Amino acid sequence: MTTESLTLSEPGDDSPARYEALTRIRLEDPDAVLRAARARRPHPGPVCGRQNFIIAADHPARGALAVKDDVHAMADRRSLLDRLRIALANPMVDGVLASPDVLDDLLLIGALEGKLLFGSMNRGGLPGLVNEIDDRFTGHTAEALAEIGADGGKMLTRIAFDSEHTTAALEATARAVDSLHERRMIAMVEPFLSTARGERVTNVLTTEAVIQSVAIAQGLGARSARTWMKLPVVEEMERVMAATTLPTVLLGGDPSSSTDEALESWRSALRLPGVQGLTVGRTLLYPDDGDVASAVETAASLLTHTTQETR
């Protein structure tokens, strides 16, 4: 079987065998992933004035499967792929941020034509580990991302002044920024000021903490020319955006609020200078009413889609 002969049912089919063809290709023809990557049509590239909409799907690789009260929401890979296919079918969605396993599935399916591709690079800081802050780069490498024609790599960078592992985490991010820059790819850095007290790492989501995390993260690496920030939406986002000249995408975060509340919080932040778009996953893939297409459509309507539009 080849990707050319791959036929899949439409999302919504509940057959447990609906993605069996992916397993067969991975077994019999693993090189099909690279062929699919090289054959696909790339995205024309980000431009100033046109905000980008990227769907994030790298949470399972960190063992983060919960969405609100459903602790195993993202555990079903078939359901996740269904939801991603629905989201990526919207022409206003520019691309995806995913771990290698998910990205390879989407390449085989052919769901990434004309899309931006960002790989998730560090997934080793599993929740609850004693050295969670030392978030090892266990996912995509810059070399592997270049091989599949990706646009960049993303790294979570948690800065905990109460953890001895913070220096190693900062150094690892800096080396990844350098490696991506050498290959002319975007380094999407997602910084948080965090605390390692207690059983789990907690991100500090005050305006001042986010500003400090930006100040530290944007200076990582020998070159910043291709570095982007990926930041949470907090109060006084205008102060946060005043802290950087780097292109910035807003993250969805832990979907603890309602889908409507999340959308409203993004609306005003997207109007700020320097905000290049949204990189959101669980809030839109697992909306309150279950309607992925509608949630994605509503989020897309918040973005500036042409370079002629003004804010």
Placement of each model-derived feature along the sequence:
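Alpha/beta catalytic barrel-like cores
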Residues: 1-136, 276, 307-311
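Alpha/beta enzyme core
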Residues: 69-91, 95, 103, 108-110, ...
